[in-house]
Structures are given as C-alpha cells and as structure tokens.
C-alpha cells in the first residue's frame, strides 16, 4: 500500500508536472530542439499510461512492481539517459510510420461509425418512446370501451335520477323533517282538504301528534294566594223539597189579598 502511494506520487510529480512545465518553457522560448524532445516524451508517456492500465490489473502482484514502475518513469525523464527519445527512435517511430495509413483509415471509419451509431440510437430511442406512448393510449381506450360495453341498457335505465343523499345534522332533525314534509293537503293529483293531511304523508314521514292541551291562564299574584272553595254537590231530593216548600208559602199570601 505504501509503495503504491509513493509510486502514484512519483508518476504525478516527475512524470506529469515537471515535463508539463518544461514543455511550456520550450514553447515560450521557441526552442525547436527542446520542443521535439518533449514531444517525443509525451508520446512515449501516453503509451506508458495506456499499458499501465493493463499491467496494474494483471501484473500488480509481481514483487517490486511499483518500484520498477517508478524507476522506469525516472529513466524516461532523466536528461542523462534520455529514455523517452531512445524508445521513440528505436520502437515507436518505426512502428507508427509502418502502420500510419492503417491507423488513419481506422480513425476515419471510427468517426463515421460513431456518427452513424449516434443517429441510429437516437432514432431507436424516439421510436421506442413513440410506440410506448401509442400502446399506453390504446390500452387506456380499450379499457374504457370495455367498461362502457359492460353496461347494458337496463343498467343505464335503472340508474335513478334521485339526488345524492344529503348530510343530516343530528342537532337539527326537527327542522330537516319539516323541510322534507309536503304541504298540507298535497297529493299526486293536486291539492286536497286539510282533513286528509295524514293520508298524504308516507309511513316514514308521518309523525304521531300529541293531543293539544288547553293553555291555562297564568294566575295573578292575588289569585294564587286565594283558596278556591268548592260548593258541595246538591242532591236532587233536597232541591225538590225546597221547591215544594216555597210553593206552600206563596199560596196563603194570595188568599189574604
């Protein structure tokens, strides 16, 4: 782990940052010799980075692998060994010059195919999206049509036109019942007398009425203090005897006159 971190640090500093600054100086001073040198270095280093991806996967278990890699980077960069220029002149330049035409043809084909593949994938994506939208629309229409067909004419006629049931407040049931009652004497045929009011109401709406009680006059304060004395019932026999007696008394008065 330590060797891997040291190796990455060496490659970053001595393999990238220092050559980048040296290339900047060569471009600024317009020194052709230095310019060619660092161009050869960057070509070799690019090939090294491409090969490093494969070697890190398959050969990283090899002992002293990271140490060898650090030594190789320093050998490429060193002005004494000139490893980058040596590898470029001996191996890279001859192989590239040999296969230059083939590489150019592959690059052109890759550009054309990449453009065509992008267009084909775009068309396929649009076609898939359009087909999915059409299928979803047809499925929804088919489901709606199936539901409508399931209803027969009898089912449609059986649907009542009655309004939806309203909410009944338990605190104001009497007011709601009075609003629901039809007017007095109302029937399907027209208005009738008030005597037939009970017959007009249905069984559910008919409410039994309590017998009306006569209103008693409120007692005055003076009357409430009085004691009502009731006369004892008079018998019939006594009333007749009194009448007879009165008649007997009236007779002698006439004779004297």
Swiss-Prot record:
Residues 183-257 are annotated as: Disordered. Expressed in circumvallate papillae and testis. It holds the Pfam family TB2_DP1_HVA22. Keywords: Cell cycle, Cell division, Endoplasmic reticulum, Membrane, Microtubule, Mitosis, Phosphoprotein, Transmembrane, Transmembrane helix. The modification Phosphoserine is found at residues 152, 194, 202, 253. InterPro entries: TB2_DP1_HVA22 (IPR004345). The chain crosses the membrane at residues 1-21, 42-62. GO terms for cellular component: cytoplasmic microtubule; endoplasmic reticulum; endoplasmic reticulum membrane; endoplasmic reticulum tubular network. The keyword Transmembrane applies. It is found in: Endoplasmic reticulum membrane. Belongs to the DP1 family. This is Receptor expression-enhancing protein 4. The keyword Membrane applies. GO terms for molecular function: microtubule binding. It comes from the Eukaryota. GO terms for biological process: cell division; endoplasmic reticulum tubular network organization; mitotic nuclear membrane reassembly; nuclear envelope organization. Microtubule-binding protein required to ensure proper cell division and nuclear envelope reassembly by sequestering the endoplasmic reticulum away from chromosomes during mitosis. Probably acts by clearing the endoplasmic reticulum membrane from metaphase chromosomes. It comes from Homo sapiens (Human).
């Amino acid at each position: 782990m330590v060797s891997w971190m040291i190796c990455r640090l060496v490659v970053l500093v001595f393999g990238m940052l220092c050559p980048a600054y040296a290339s900047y100086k060569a471009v600024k001073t317009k020194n052709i010799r230095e310019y060619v040198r660092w161009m050869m270095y960057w070509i070799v280093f690019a090939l090294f980075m491409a090969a490093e991806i494969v070697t890190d996967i398959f050969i990283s278990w090899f002992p002293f692998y990271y140490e060898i890699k650090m030594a190789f980077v320093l050998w490429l960069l060193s002005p004494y060994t000139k490893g980058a220029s040596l590898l470029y002149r001996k191996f890279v330049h001859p192989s590239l010059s040999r296969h230059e035409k083939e590489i150019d043809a592959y690059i052109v084909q890759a550009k054309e195919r990449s453009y065509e593949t992008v267009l084909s994938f775009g068309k396929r994506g649009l076609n898939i999206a359009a087909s999915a939208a059409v299928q979803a629309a047809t499925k929804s229409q088919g489901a709606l049509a199936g539901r409508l067909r399931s209803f027969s004419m009898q089912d449609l006629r059986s649907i009542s036109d009655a309004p939806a049931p309203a909410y009944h407040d338990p605190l104001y049931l009497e007011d709601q019942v009075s609003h629901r009652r039809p007017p007095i004497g109302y029937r399907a045929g027209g208005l009738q007398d008030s005597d037939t009011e009970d017959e007009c109401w249905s069984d559910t709406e008919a409410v039994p009425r309590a017998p009306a009680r006569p209103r008693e006059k409120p007692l005055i304060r003076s009357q409430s203090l009085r004691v009502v004395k009731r006369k004892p019932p008079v018998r019939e026999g006594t009333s007749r005897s009194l009448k007879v007696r009165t008649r007997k008394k009236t007779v002698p008065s006439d004779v004297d006159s």
